[in-house]
Each structure stands twice: as structure tokens, then as C-alpha cells.
Amino acid sequence: MGADATGPGVGALTVRRGVPAGAERRVAELYWDAFGRKLGPALNPADKAVPFIAAHLNTDRAVCALLDGRIVGLAGYQHGGRALTGGSAAAVLRAYGHLRGLHRLLLLALFERRPAPGQLVMDGIAVDPDLRGRGVGSLLIEEVAAVAAEQDCREIRLDVIDTNPRARALYERRGFTAVRTEHTPYLRGLLGFGAVTTMRRLVGTGSGENRER
């Protein structure tokens, strides 16, 4: 399933489920561009991180936006014990070595989130920088919401960091509400953020907007 839409000034966008075969590298690059600052201490350098992410994607745990056949955005989600980004502890140690890999595993553990029964957890949205603010994120969120409904989930949950107010504003427009903020000042110097807000949206609800503003 998927959707077609026309974004302001960008032409026809197609939203599809799953990562197309052969597009793993492109997805990893977009993901790293969006989340590299946060994930950098665990996966740097970029020339090692991007191939690692690409090699360990669960390609059925994403919805992608395409423009003229090229992926310009994606949203990952976690359900049924699997998320978009994978990679076992053994894979991390193979890629980075045992000495340097152990502390990376500890950092990656900070980002682990498990859905409660009836929840689908979103792993964040990554959009091509040239197309941000043109409706791509809204289309991706609504497709994830459709996935959640089909899986009989009651709600969608996500976390947003305090240094990404634009993403939080988008989530609020699409019907998410903040339920808890965890202040983590001890992580600011290491990961670049000092608070994480958990947001939820009931499945079957949303906003009346069709596009990002």
C-alpha cells in the first residue's frame, strides 16, 4: 500500500512501504544526515557508520517517500520486536573491533525503546534537506499511522530531543501530544541534547492539516 500526493513546488510524491531493493545506501545516508549528531558517538566515523546502517536495515520497517523514483524521505518504526535499524552486538564488535566496540554498545543501549502492548514506536523521520518543509514528513507520518491501524495498535509513540523543535512542531500538527520529558543534561556534551520528550498519538486520530507549514 502507499499514497500519491503533490507537495508544494515538488511535483508528485509517492509514499510506499518498505525500502526498495538497492536503496539501502540512500536510506542510510538520509538517516545519518538526520540523526548522525545523536548517533555519532556510537557509530562515527560517517564512512563507517553509513555502510553499517545500510547493511543492517530491516527494510520492511520503513515507509519511504519517492520523487521521480528517488527516495527523498523515510520514517522508520518498531513493531513486533523489529525496528528499521538493526545490528546485533556481535555485528557492532565485528565492525568496530572489541576494544572500541564495547563503549559503542553502551551508547547504543541508551537509544533502545521497546513498545508497550498496543503501541507502535516511530524511530524518527529523515527528509532530504532540499525538500524539508514541503509536506514530505506529514505524508510519512500518515502512512505510519495507517500501518499502526492495520496492526491493531492503539497508539503511536515517539521520542523527540530538545534540539529539534522543528520536528516536535510537525508531530504536534499531526496530532501527537507530549506526555513526558526526561531531562538528561549529562548527555548534552556527549550527544548534543539535554532532554527527550515522549509523544503519543492515538490511532485513528490526527490533524486536519494535509501538509507541513
Where are these regions (language model features)?
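Conserved GNAT-family N-acetyltransferase fold
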Residues: 63, 75, 120, 125, ...
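Conserved GNAT-fold acetyl-CoA-binding loop/helix
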Residues: 32-53, 84-98
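Conserved acetyl-CoA-binding loop-helix of GNAT-fold acetyltransferases
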Residues: 133-146, 169, 173
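A short beta-loop-alpha structural element at the N-terminal edge
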Residues: 12-29, 40
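Active-site rim helix/loop that mediates acceptor-substrate recognition in acyltransferases
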Residues: 41-68, 72-82, 111
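Conserved GNAT acetyl-CoA-binding A-motif
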Residues: 119-120, 148-159
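C-terminal "cap" of GNAT-fold acetyltransferases
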Residues: 154-155, 161-168, 174, 184-213
